[in-house]
């Protein structure tokens, strides 16, 4: 595996779902207090030996980061607003990924160590009877039971040791009378022990033939926080990535590039006191224009920005009153469309940086947008509605209703005739501008559907002789391929073990890449549904994407890494 350290130059992602964290939020909201101020929590050990002060701001920030990293971005946003995360003085770029989990693990180890200490201060000699869960660790009855079990096992060990010593004394003369037989038993005992270890069941692994070798994987290092999104330049092998470290980066993967500079760092700054200072906000969305000369980024600081391909800031677009969740260029390249938590969508003039029109039709945060053509687009929201709007019109030209929970993503098919939507209500719906109700209401996933993608096949594509497909990725750890003409699922792809955040078709539509929080990128044959390539990274995968030639897959991860898989033979 090649690792590029990446020299700095001078210069959407929105994980969904929230139900599972409601009790956690409730607990920490109580801790924070009704006004959201910073409170001190004084703690000490049971023996009163050590004291520490923990501010609720610190606890809130770690919970907020945990929600983001685990994909509960709606919950993270709500919790961040109520706990005033943006007003805290914590520099998020200095906090490592999985910080809350790390602290919890250390606390769990402390409790296990405490259980293992006897009343006389000696340490119990032996492994825990069984592993201690996080819930067990906070329940006094369970801890006391474990301590009693430890003491009982210690007593048994002491009794067994005494009996063994007595038996050893009795058999000593027998051993001396037949030393060769004793040595033989010892040697065989070692052999049997080794055989027993090697005979343990191993976790099932993917067939070695599909594993992508490390020589075909390049890991790009440089980001200092999780990388939410990545996108290939449509013309050249430049890979853009957006991170929680308040930067986007452009990685040059062209084979003829000199190896001196592996990345351009696009620092997202805001103006304070006449100076540019880091925004310390996540870069949540990015998109290249059609000819690959400009990159647009959206940030939690509420600004969209346009950058040149060599990393220079061309313009800053500021009219949203809160984080930007999604951002897209139109095909012509003259307009940029953005969706914000302020419940609005905005069309921007890419040349002047001015807002052409703001659309305030949603009653809750807008989560995703997609252009139907150069003037018309669709938007979806946590308000469960989908609006189709057109530049110059002061009201939606169409509104689709039918989902019973937040609508996470929307995508027009290549012809612009059909609109697909997916939701936390576990359904996938297909809409037409010709009717009010959905054409298909597809129900097969058993958890929230996070994202969807149409294949680049069928009418209005460069692959007109191949049937069009739709892929859906869900928190149920599966990916499904759909025949939309018949309204049926043709393949269920089940190798992932954790929520699937991203899917992407190869340019010819023959392959599908999927990325999951299980750290795996899988490449599937879309006709057979077979797994053809697999790669396990070092962090949960937020985004996967194909380059224009279809021979490389980029993936962004929760540990700050960006991986490029070379699929050429």
Curated annotation (Swiss-Prot):
GO terms for cellular component: histone deacetylase complex; mitotic spindle; transcription repressor complex. Pfam families: LisH, WD40. The keyword Acetylation applies. Its main location: nucleus. Gene3D superfamilies: 1.20.960.30, YVTN repeat-like/Quinoprotein amine dehydrogenase. The keyword Calcium does not apply. Residues 170-195 are annotated as: Disordered. It comes from the Eukaryota. One of its GO terms (molecular function) is histone binding. There is a cross-link at residue 332 (Glycyl lysine isopeptide (Lys-Gly) (interchain with G-Cter in SUMO2)). The modification N6-acetyllysine is found at residue 153. It is found in: Nucleus. WD repeats lie at residues 222-261, 278-317, 319-358, 361-401, 402-441, 444-492, 495-534, 536-568. Residues 92-137 form the F-box-like domain. Belongs to the WD repeat EBI family. This is F-box-like/WD repeat-containing protein TBL1X.
């Amino acid at each position: 595996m090649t690792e590029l350290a990446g020299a700095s130059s001078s210069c959407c992602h929105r994980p969904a779902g929230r139900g599972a964290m409601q009790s956690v939020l409730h607990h920490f909201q109580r801790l924070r207090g009704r006004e959201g101020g910073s409170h001190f929590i004084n703690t000490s050990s049971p023996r009163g030996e050590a004291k520490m002060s923990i501010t609720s701001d610190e606890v809130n920030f770690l919970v907020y980061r945990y929600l983001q990293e685990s994909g509960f971005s709606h919950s993270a946003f709500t919790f961040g607003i109520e706990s005033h995360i943006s007003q805290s003085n914590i520099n998020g770029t200095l906090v490592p990924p999985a910080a809350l989990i790390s602290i919890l693990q250390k606390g769990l180890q402390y409790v296990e160590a405490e259980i293992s200490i006897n009343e006389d201060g000696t340490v119990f000699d032996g492994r825990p009877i069984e592993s201690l869960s996080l819930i067990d660790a906070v329940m006094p009855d369970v801890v006391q039971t474990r301590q009693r079990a430890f003491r009982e096992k210690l007593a048994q060990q002491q009794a067994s040791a005494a009996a063994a010593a007595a038996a050893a004394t009795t058999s000593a003369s027998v051993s001396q009378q037949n030393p060769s037989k004793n040595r033989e038993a010892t040697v065989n005992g070692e052999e049997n022990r080794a055989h027993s270890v090697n005979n343990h069941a191993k976790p099932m692994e993917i067939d070695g033939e599909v594993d992508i070798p490390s020589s075909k994987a390049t890991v790009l290092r440089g980001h200092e926080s999780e990388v939410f999104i990545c996108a290939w330049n449509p013309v050249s092998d430049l890979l853009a990535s957006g991170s929680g470290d308040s930067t986007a980066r452009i990685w040059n993967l062209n084979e003829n590039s000199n190896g001196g500079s592996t990345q351009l760092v696009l620092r997202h700054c805001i103006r304070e006191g006449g100076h540019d200072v880091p925004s310390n906000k996540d870069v949540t969305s990015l998109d290249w224009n059609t000819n690959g000369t400009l990159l647009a980024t959206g940030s939690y600081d509420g600004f969209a920005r346009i950058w040149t391909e060599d990393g220079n800031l061309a313009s800053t677009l500021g009219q949203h009153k809160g984080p930007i969740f999604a951002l897209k260029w139109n095909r012509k390249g003259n307009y940029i469309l953005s969706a914000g938590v302020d419940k609005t969508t905005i069309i921007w003039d890419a040349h002047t940086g001015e807002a052409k029109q703001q659309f305030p039709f949603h009653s809750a945060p807008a989560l995703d947008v997609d252009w139907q053509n150069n003037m018309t687009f669709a938007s979806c929201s946590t308000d469960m509605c989908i609006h189709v709007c057109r530049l110059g019109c002061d009201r939606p030209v169409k509104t689709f209703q039918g989902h019973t929970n937040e609508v996470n993503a929307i995508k027009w098919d290549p012809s612009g005739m059909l609109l697909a939507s997916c939701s936390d209500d576990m359904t996938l719906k297909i809409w037409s501008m010709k009717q009010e109700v959905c054409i298909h209401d597809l129900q097969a996933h058993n958890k929230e559907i996070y994202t969807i993608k149409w294949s680049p096949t069928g009418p209005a594509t460069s692959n007109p002789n191949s049937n069009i497909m739709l892929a859906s990725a869900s928190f149920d750890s599966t990916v499904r391929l759909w025949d939309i003409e018949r309204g049926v699922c043709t393949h269920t792809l089940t190798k992932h073990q954790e929520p699937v955040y991203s899917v992407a078709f190869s340019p010819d539509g023959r392959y599908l890449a999927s990325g999951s929080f299980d750290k795996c990128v899988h490449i599937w044959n879309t006709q057979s549904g077979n797994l053809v390539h697999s790669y396990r990274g070092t962090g949960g995968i937020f985004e996967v994407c194909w380059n224009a030639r279809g021979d490389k897959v980029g993936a962004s991860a929760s540990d700050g890494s960006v991986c490029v898989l070379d699929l050429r033979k």
